[in-house]
A protein has these predicted regions:
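Structural preference for solvent-exposed beta-strand-turn elements
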Residues: 1-182
Length: 182
């Protein structure tokens, strides 16, 4: 459960990232294809279960309509993509898996509190002027992906941020340790 958020968070790194114990699963294939589409250099040794990601030469823009579909973790790309590109625009909500489509509202609320501007003019638009800013947020309910969105947005933001009612599962803690190591 930790690998997808960590792969999304790798977009926050200014240099190459090396990861191990990467399983060859469909969602990772989709995420790797998306990363390559936006200009990332990926070296994935499936036998050794290692991956080297370098996002230092990303395209200057991208079509967010090309976010990986059919995976719940697509929403975890919002904060890293905003950090990199300053704006994203979506035709529709990212679709989920058989477990159900995840709500976007908690993610949008968090991004807004951390300084993002949200618009709904026929498309969902999210933008930031510079960097995310520190904020305090009380989550209505514990959510792993909402907590991960908050942590990724706050990690490189200006000032201190606090999320009350955060999820604390081991894979959320793995993401936090990864971000601290960058």
């Amino acid at each position: 459960n930790a690998v997808l958020p960590i792969l999304c968070a790798s977009l926050l790194s200014s240099g190459p990232v090396e990861l191990s114990n990467i399983p060859a699963i469909t969602d990772i294939e989709k995420l790797v294809a998306f990363f390559r589409q936006i200009g990332s250099q990926i070296d994935w040794n499936r036998e050794a279960k290692t991956m080297r990601l370098d996002h230092s030469n990303l395209e200057s823009s991208f079509n967010a309509g090309d976010l990986p579909q059919g995976m719940r973790s697509s929403v975890l790309l919002f904060a890293p993509l905003l950090y990199r590109f300053k704006k994203i625009s979506l035709d529709s909500n990212p679709k989920g898996c058989a477990l159900g489509i995840r709500e976007l509202d908690p993610h949008l609320e968090i991004l807004s509190q951390l300084g993002a501007k949200i618009s709904h003019n026929g498309r969902l638009g999210i933008s930031i002027t510079d960097r995310f800013k520190g904020a305090e947020h009380w989550a209505d309910y514990m959510s792993v992906t909402t907590t991960e969105t908050f942590v990724m947005a706050a990690a490189l933001g200006m000032g201190n941020s606090t999320l009350t009612n955060a999820a604390s599962e081991p894979h959320v803690q793995d993401l936090c340790r990864f971000l601290e190591s960058m």
